[in-house]
Amino acid sequence: MLTIDAVGTPVFSDAIDIANARIRFANGCVVNATASRVSLRMERKMRIFEDDAYLSLDLQQKILTLIRKREGSGTPGQLPVQIEEQRLEQGDALKAEIEAFLECIRTGRPPTVSGEDGLAALETAMRITEQVNESLAARRLTEAGLDV
C-alpha cells in the first residue's frame, strides 16, 4: 500500500455520519470506499474498473453487472458495450467463513486469506479510522477558531 487519505464528518449527530477513504496501492490500484449513515437508500456496492470492462457488484441485491467493451463501432450514439447481469447465490457469509476455517483445520490446507493478510487488512482499517478521527478533530479546532 502506498497512501491512505481518509476523512469523516458528522452530519446529523455528534458522531461521524459519513466517511470516505482513498487507498492507493504500489501497483497503481486505487480504492475509494465510503461509509454513510445519511444516505437516502441502503446500499452495499463494489465497483471494479478494468481497461475494457466495468463490474458493479450489488451486495445488497446480490446482482453482478458486467459491462464489457465490444469490438466494432456499434450503433451511432450508443457505446459499443455488452451488458451481462447475473444473480448471485444467496448465502451466509459468516457460516461460509467458519466452514472454510474448519476445513483448513481438518485438511491442513492453508486458508484463503492468510493471517498476515488479515493483519494487514486490520492495520489498514485502523489507519483509516485514525485519519477519520484526526480529520474530525481538525475540523472542530478550525470551527473553534484555532489553527490546526
Please describe what each predicted stretch is.
Residues 46-48, 62-76:
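Short polybasic amphipathic segments
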Residues 19, 43, 63, 70, ...:
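Residue-level detector of alpha-helical recognition elements and their boundaries
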Residues 76-84:
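Short glycine/proline- and charge-enriched loop/turn segments
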Residues 57, 66, 121-122:
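Short active-site-adjacent structural elements
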Residues 26, 100-148:
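C-terminal helix-rich "cap/oligomerization" subdomain common to oxidoreductases
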Residues 1-62, 91, 95-109, 144-148:
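Contiguous beta-strand/loop segments that form the cofactor/metal-binding neighborhood of enzyme cores
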Residues 83-92:
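A short glycine-threonine-serine/GTX helix/turn-capping micro-motif
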Residues 16-17, 69, 125-126:
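Short secondary-structure transition/capping segments
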